[in-house]
Amino acid sequence: MREPEELMPDSGAVFTFGKSKFAENNPGKFWFKNDVPVHLSCGDEHSAVVTGNNKLYMFGSNNWGQLGLGSKSAISKPTCVKALKPEKVKLAACGRNHTLVSTEGGNVYATGGNNEGQLGLGDTEERNTFHVISFFTSEHKIKQLSAGSNTSAALTEDGRLFMWGDNSEGQIGLKNVSNVCVPQQVTIGKPVSWISCGYYHSAFVTTDGELYVFGEPENGKLGLPNQLLGNHRTPQLVSEIPEKVIQVACGGEHTVVLTENAVYTFGLGQFGQLGLGTFLFETSEPKVIENIRDQTISYISCGENHTALITDIGLMYTFGDGRHGKLGLGLENFTNHFIPTLCSNFLRFIVKLVACGGCHMVVFAAPHRGVAKEIEFDEINDTCLSVATFLPYSSLTSGNVLQRTLSARMRRRERERSPDSFSMRRTLPPIEGTLGLSACFLPNSVFPRCSERNLQESVLSEQDLMQPEEPDYLLDEMTKEAEIDNSSTVESLGETTDILNMTHIMSLNSNEKSLKLSPVQKQKKQQTIGELTQDTALTENDDSDEYEEMSEMKEGKACKQHVSQGIFMTQPATTIEAFSDEEVGNDTGQVGPQADTDGEGLQKEVYRHENNNGVDQLDAKEIEKESDGGHSQKESEAEEIDSEKETKLAEIAGMKDLREREKSTKKMSPFFGNLPDRGMNTESEENKDFVKKRESCKQDVIFDSERESVEKPDSYMEGASESQQGIADGFQQPEAIEFSSGEKEDDEVETDQNIRYGRKLIEQGNEKETKPIISKSMAKYDFKCDRLSEIPEEKEGAEDSKGNGIEEQEVEANEENVKVHGGRKEKTEILSDDLTDKAEDHEFSKTEELKLEDVDEEINAENVESKKKTVGDDESVPTGYHSKTEGAERTNDDSSAETIEKKEKANLEERAICEYNENPKGYMLDDADSSSLEILENSETTPSKDMKKTKKIFLFKRVPSINQKIVKNNNEPLPEIKSIGDQIILKSDNKDADQNHMSQNHQNIPPTNTERRSKSCTIL
C-alpha cells in the first residue's frame, strides 16, 4: 500500500469519506502497489478491504476487537491481517461490532462482539482475533456474506442461506427463537441469490427475482402492508414490486431494492436516504426513484442513514445523511441530500466498488486512461457540489428543494465567485429562463477533465440537464419544509406575497443602487400610521411605567391589528439593524437580528449591537452632518449608506417584492421623510403604513417600549408605537437637529410647509445647539442604544422592556434612519412636535389627530412653525432627553433644571399644538390628558388592538395635531410639558380614550404626568 505522495496508479485507489478513522471527517485515499481491491465492506465504525491477492486489510474502530488484530486499539491505517494470509481471503462482511470473513478454502472466520452469538462460535464471548466457524466446511462454498447489528448471514453458491445471532425482532428469519449462536438455515423452498442484513431487519432475493423481508416491522422498512406485518419474524414476500429483483440492501431504517429497470426504496427517510425527495420521509410501499430512471444502476449499498448507487458506466450517486461528509460530495457539503446526487469528485474515475457504513463510506475507483495524475479533493470539491446539485432532476423544482444543501464554506466560495448572482440566487424567486448560477458547474469547467469516453459524454449530457436546474435545487428538501414553515429563512426573506406572512421587505434605495431589508409592519392606513407615530412620540415622553400599562393593553391589540407579534418584533429589529447598518455600518450583524422574529430580547440585543457598533457616534455625527449638510444631502447620503447596507441585506435576501416595497416605502418617505431609507425604503406601499407605524412604534419603543414592549410582543406594537412616539419626541429633537439636514426630507414629506418650518426650527436649533444637540442626539442615540441595551438592565417591565426595548431599538433605528434621510426627518420633527403636543395635550392630540387627518397639511404648516420652536426646544431637549433616555427612567432629575426650561419652550409649542389640535377636534388639552390617563388605565385592561388603532390614527393625525398643538403650545403654559411623558402615554392611551372616554382619566394623569414630566424634563 502506498500513500498519495506518488501518482495514483492506473489500477485506482480506495477513497474514504466520513468518520473512517483513516481520515476523520475528511476525504482520504490510499492504494496498493501491485494489488487492487476486489471487495469492500463497512460496519458501523470499521472497514475491510479484500485485495486481488487475497489479502485482508482492516481499519477503524476496534473497541470490540472487530478488526481481528489481537488488540482493541483503533487502527487509522489499513492494516493487513497477517493471520489470514495463508487462507486467501475471498469475502468479508462488517457488522455493527463484528466481522465475518470467508476464504477460498470454504472456511468462515469471525471476530469482534458476540453478545448475541453473532460470531457463530457456539458461545457469546467476544473475540479480538479471527476464529473459524466450525459449522462451515469445504462443502459450503460461500457466495456472499452479510452482517447486521448483531446478526450474521452466509449464502452459498447453491442458494442455501444460513443465519445466526440476534433474533429478537425476527431478523434472522427463525420464528420461535430469540437468538442462536450457531448458523441456522433459513428456507422458503426456493434458492436464494442475494442476502442483506440491516441493523434490525434483513432481506434476500430468490433466484426467480422475488424479494423476501423479515425483522423489525417499524417505519415501513419491510415494505409490507399492515396485514402482513404480524408475520414479520418469518420471511414475507414483497409483492408490490412487479419487476424482477436483482439486489437488495438494508440500512438502519430503510431498504433499497434494485430491479432490472429501476431502483425502489421504502422505510424511513428522514435524512433523505430514500432518495424520494423532501415530501416523503416514510413509506411502507416500495417507491421508484424517478430521478435516476435514465441511469442503469449496477450496484446498490446502504449505510445506516445513507445510500450509494453505482451506474453501469462507473458514475456514483449518493443521498441521505451528509454528516461527516460521508456522501462524498465534497469538503463543503455535509448537508443531507434527499435525491440521488452525482458525486462529481469521481467524474474522472470509474467507480467500481462502494460500501456504506454507519458514519462513513469507502469507494474504490480507477481513473480514466490518461488521467492518472494526482487528484486533490479540494479542487474536486468545488466542482463536485455544483455538479451534484445541478443534476438533471427534472421533476424537482427550486421550490421543492431547500437552500441548505450548500455548506457555509461553499456558500462563501460561491459568493466570492459571484456574490451578486449567488445572493440573488438564494434570495430571489426563480426567474424564468436561464439562471445565473455562479456555483453551478458548467460542463466546460468540470467535464473537460473527464476522459473522452462515452462516460464523459453521458456526464456532459447529465450536467447539461443539471444546468437548467435552478440553484434552489441545491437546497435540502428536508430543510425545504422547515423553510416553508419558517419562510425567513434567513436566506429567502419574503418569498411569500402574503403580507400577513411577511416579516421583512427588501426595497431598493431611492437611488436604486442598493437593496434594503426592513421589517414589514402591517397597518390599515397611513393616517393610522401617522397617528401611531404621534402616539409613540407622546408615549416616549411618558415613563416606562405608564407606557408599560399602555403596552400591555396594546400588546393584545397590536397582535390583533398587526398580523403577528413576530412581525412587529422582527421589524423593529430590522429597523435597528438597518439603522446600525447605515449609522454603524454593520450590515450583516444587524441583518442577523432582523431575521429574528423574537420581538423582545432580540430587538434589545440588536439595538445594543448597534450601540456597540458605534451607532451613537455615527448618529451624532450624522446628525451634525445632516443638520449642517441639509436634509437633501443627508437624505441622499443616508440613502446611499442605506442603499449600500441594504444592498448587503439584499444580497442576503434580495427580493423583487422587497424592491417594490422599498419604492412604496419611498413614497411613504415623504411622510416619514425623517426616517432613513433603512427601515422605510425597503417596505412596499402596503407596508408603508405598517412601516410608518413601525417607525413610530419603534420610536416610541425606544423610550417607553424598552421597558414595556419587552414584556410583550403585542405591547411591542403599541408599546413600540408609544415608545417610538416618545422616541420621536425625544429623538426627534436630535432628529430635529438632523432635520436641518432632514428639512429636505421634510420637503419630500407631504407636509412640506411644516417640514420647512420644522427645518427652520431645526436649523435654528441646530445653529444654536447644533453641536450640543448633535452630541445630545448622539447621546440620545447612544442612550437609546444604551437604553435598549439597558432594557434588560432597567427591566421596569423586565420582559415588557425586552419586547418594547426591541421596539425601541427599532424605533431608534428608524429615527436614526430618519436622520439619515431628511425627508424622513420630517416625521421625526413631527414626532418631536408630538412630544411637545403630547406633553401638553396627549388627549387632544388623539382627538385632534382624527380631525388632523384632514387638516394635516395646514397643521403641518403650523406644526412646522411650532416645530421650529419645539425643535429648538427639542434640540435642547434631545440631549438631556436622550441622556435621560439612557438613564431617563433611572435618573429623572439629572437634567431636570435644563429640561424644565426646555420643557417650558416645548410646552408652549406643545400647548399651541395641543390647543390647535383641540380646536380641530373640539377637545380640551386636559381632556386629552385625562383621556390618555384613562386610556392608560383602560389600556391595561383593554386589548392591544384598540390601543394600537388609536395610536395608529394618532400617528398620522398626530403630526397635524402636533402642529395644532404647537400653535396652542405657544399660547399655553409650560407646566403640561412636564407631563409630556405622561401625555405620551396618555396620548397613546388617548387613542383608546378617544374611543373610550377622552376626559375621564386626564385628571388622574397629572401626578403621573408630573413624574413623567420631571423625567421628561430630565430627559430634555
From Swiss-Prot:
Disease: Retinitis pigmentosa 3: An X-linked retinal dystrophy belonging to the group of pigmentary retinopathies. Retinitis pigmentosa is characterized by retinal pigment deposits visible on fundus examination and primary loss of rod photoreceptor cells followed by secondary loss of cone photoreceptors. Patients typically have night vision blindness and loss of midperipheral visual field. As their condition progresses, they lose their far peripheral visual field and eventually central vision as well.
Lineage per the UniProt record: Eukaryota, Metazoa, Chordata, Craniata, Vertebrata
Comp. bias regions, Basic and acidic residues: 618-636, 644-665, 685-698, 704-715, 760-771, 790-802, 816-853, 883-906
Record Pfam families: WD40_RLD
An annotated GO BP: protein localization to non-motile cilium
Keywords: Cell projection, Ciliopathy, Cilium, Cilium biogenesis/degradation, Cone-rod dystrophy, Cytoplasm, Cytoskeleton, Deafness, Disease variant, Flagellum, Golgi apparatus, Guanine-nucleotide releasing factor, Lipoprotein, Methylation, Phosphoprotein, Prenylation, Repeat, Retinitis pigmentosa, Sensory transduction, Vision
Impact upon substituting V36F: Does not reduce interaction with PDE6D
Function: Acts as a guanine-nucleotide releasing factor (GEF) for RAB8A and RAB37 by promoting the conversion of inactive RAB-GDP to the active form RAB-GTP. GEF activity towards RAB8A may facilitate ciliary trafficking by modulating ciliary intracellular localization of RAB8A. GEF activity towards RAB37 maintains autophagic homeostasis and retinal function. Involved in photoreceptor integrity. May control cilia formation by regulating actin stress filaments and cell contractility. May be involved in microtubule organization and regulation of transport in primary cilia.
GO molecular function: guanyl-nucleotide exchange factor activity; RNA binding; ubiquitin protein ligase activity
Full protein name: X-linked retinitis pigmentosa GTPase regulator
PTM-bearing positions, type Phosphoserine: S418, S518
Compartments, as annotated in UniProt: Cytoplasm, Cytoskeleton, Flagellum axoneme; Golgi apparatus; Cell projection, Cilium
Tissue specificity comment: Heart, brain, placenta, lung, liver, muscle, kidney, retina, pancreas and fetal retinal pigment epithelium. Isoform 3 is found only in the retina. Colocalizes with RPGRIP1 in the outer segment of rod photoreceptors and cone outer segments.
Organism whose genome encodes this protein: Homo sapiens (Human)
RCC1-type repeats, residues: 54-105, 106-158, 159-208, 209-261, 262-313, 314-367
Record propeptide residues: 1018-1020
Quaternary structure (record): Interacts with SPATA7. Interacts with CEP290. Interacts with WHRN. Interacts with PDE6D. Interacts with RPGRIP1. Interacts with RPGRIP1L. PDE6D, RPGRIP1 and RPGRIP1L may compete for the same binding sites. Interacts with RAB37 and RAB8A (in GDP-bound forms); functions as GEF for RAB37 and RAB8A.
Domain notes: The RCC1 repeat region mediates interactions with RPGRIP1.
Effect of A262G: In RP3; uncertain significance
PTM annotation, UniProt: Prenylated.
S-S bridge residues: none
